Design a protein with these regions (language model features):
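Extended acidic low-complexity intrinsically disordered regions
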Residues: 1-14
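Short acidic-hydrophobic surface loop/beta-edge motif
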Residues: 14-24
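Short, surface-exposed, charged amphipathic helix/loop patches that serve as local interaction elements
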Residues: 24-124
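Generic detector of low-complexity/intrinsically disordered segments
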Residues: 5-8, 22, 26
């Protein structure tokens, strides 16, 4: 297949099932790759100004945003999933341990074309 044909026919939002670890072992969720605009949206939400007035990345805000955007099943933007909580990232932070959030966010990043090294760099 020609490169141009491959690019034209490519679905960059393909889905993938991942198995969770720890207390959630045995549970499978479906994630999807995020696109460039969604990456920028998640990163913008994670930028905080520190005490020195400098911008920094809040890793938990970034990871919970990536999880809210990149999870297909369950869909954390669906009000039926959220119950009484109205903000997807708040639901995620209330119902998942920090390590679980990081694990899922890293899987979404890897599925979006970032390797392990790029995931670490993106969080800096």
């Amino acid at each position: 297949m020609e490169l141009l044909d491959l690019i034209r026919n490519r679905d960059i939002r393909d889905t993938k099932e991942i198995d969770l670890k720890g207390e959630l072992a045995g549970i499978t969720i479906t994630i999807r790759a995020i696109d460039a605009d969604e990456w920028q949206e998640a990163r913008a939400r994670a930028i905080k100004i520190n005490a020195k007035g400098e911008p920094t990345v809040d890793n938990m805000a970034l990871s919970s945003s990536l999880m809210a955007i990149g999870c297909v099943n369950p869909n954390f933007r669906d009000p039926a999933v959220l119950g009484g909580i109205t903000v997807p990232t708040e639901f995620i932070k209330a119902k998942f341990k920090p390590g679980e959030i990081e694990f899922i966010a890293n899987k979404i990043m890897q599925h979006s074309g970032y390797g392990e090294e790029a995931v670490d760099t993106a969080k800096k």
